């Protein structure tokens, strides 16, 4: 019985601490977001992202990055294209918390770099600029992550 109670306390503690991770830790610790982690790290935006009070991240899964052509993928990672990389990374973040449960129909908002994003719900499925949210409402210390099936490319 003691072992059961200790195991229960450990599992409850790990659940409550999961929400205590910041956005950068949440990305780097998720094995399905390693490509996004690489982009965030190379963009040198880590400190900027930690400065926001609340954020929602529409996080492309590694498979979404794999769908990009090699030229596009490595083009963003080229040192000469840091501005483009930063624009791409920032395009996936929205200031504030956008919970899947609170979005009824269609809303337009701005990414943290000021570009428009259309978020809509169709038959209970959330989309952002046409990318499907395949897993929603992953909480971190000051916001929310929604995993998407496509990389959002700013215009």
Predicted features and spans:
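Generic cytosolic/nucleocytoplasmic N-terminal low-complexity/intrinsically disordered segments
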Residues: 1-2, 109
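Bacterial Sec-dependent N-terminal signal peptides
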Residues: 2-3, 41
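Sec-dependent N-terminal signal peptides
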Residues: 4-13
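Mature, structured domains of secreted/extracytosolic soluble proteins
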Residues: 16-155
